């Protein structure tokens, strides 16, 4: 059996979920596929949603903390505080619930979704792209007029069509903790070779917990990772 769609979106994160929903609203037949068995897992980012993006999806009830400012620490320990309590800079959200809601809205608009599914091949023909998708252990053939890759930094779509790779790769490490001394509405940013060689580290209040992480180049972290 061949499954035919106007558009296939690979990756059911917030971008893939939002894109597929908007396309379905425009009366396109859309298939959204996700390699994991559930939406929002694994959690792979700091969980910040800027005001413009939040306004588009309207999922304010998924927010854990409203961020309006920051405490920034220089390599020498000097602290600079910025922000205005009256101006929201970003929202710290529960990514699992946020992602699920974005995808649920897409499905409500008519999107089909296959979980535990990942593409095995995609060949461009004159009028369509023919894909073989492993869907929970069963191979399915899909034909689509448009294939969209929303599958992240290690995109299968990018690799399959040899669309190049980023000139520079960085790595992020993060842990969620309790007991960190935060200031209401402010996140912390740290710079310096001792704490974040090559870039910066952060501490983001997220309701009753704090997400502490670092962004750097793998070769610079060494034993620090």
Regions found by a protein language model. Give the residues of each.
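N-terminal Rossmann-fold NAD(P) dinucleotide-binding loop
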Residues: 16-17
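Short beta-strand/turn micro-motifs composed of small residues
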Residues: 11, 34, 74, 216
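Predominantly flavin-linked oxidoreductase catalytic cores and closely associated redox partners
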Residues: 12, 26, 105-225
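Short, hinge-like loop/turn segments at secondary-structure boundaries
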Residues: 47-51, 166
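Glycine-rich FAD pyrophosphate-binding loop
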Residues: 8, 21-43
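A conserved beta-strand/loop capping segment in the N-terminal third of enzymes
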Residues: 50-103
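Beta1/beta-strand and adjacent pyrophosphate-binding region of the FAD-binding site
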Residues: 1-13
């Amino acid at each position: 059996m061949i499954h035919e769609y106007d558009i296939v979106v690979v990756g059911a994160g917030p971008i893939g979920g939002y894109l597929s929903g908007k396309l379905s609203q425009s009366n396109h037949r859309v298939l959204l596929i996700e390699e994991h068995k559930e939406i929002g897992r694994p959690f792979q980012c700091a969980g910040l949603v800027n005001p413009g993006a939040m306004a588009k999806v309207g999922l304010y009830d998924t927010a854990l903390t409203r961020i309006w400012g920051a405490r920034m620490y220089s390599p020498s320990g000097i602290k600079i505080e910025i922000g205005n309590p009256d101006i929201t800079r970003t929202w710290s959200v529960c990514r699992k619930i946020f992602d699920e809601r974005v995808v649920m809205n897409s499905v409500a608009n008519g999107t089909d979704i296959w979980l535990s599914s990942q593409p095995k091949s995609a060949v461009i023909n004159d009028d369509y792209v023919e894909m073989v998708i492993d869907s929970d252990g069963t191979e399915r053939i899909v034909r689509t007029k448009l294939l969209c890759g929303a599958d992240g930094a290690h995109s299968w779509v990018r690799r399959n069509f040899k669309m190049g790779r980023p000139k520079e790769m960085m790595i992020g490490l993060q842990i969620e903790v309790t007991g960190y001394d935060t200031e209401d509405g402010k996140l912390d940013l740290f710079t310096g070779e001792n704490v974040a060689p090559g870039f910066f580290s952060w501490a983001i209040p997220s309701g009753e917990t704090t997400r502490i992480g670092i962004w750097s180049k793998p070769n610079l972290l060494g034993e620090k990772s």
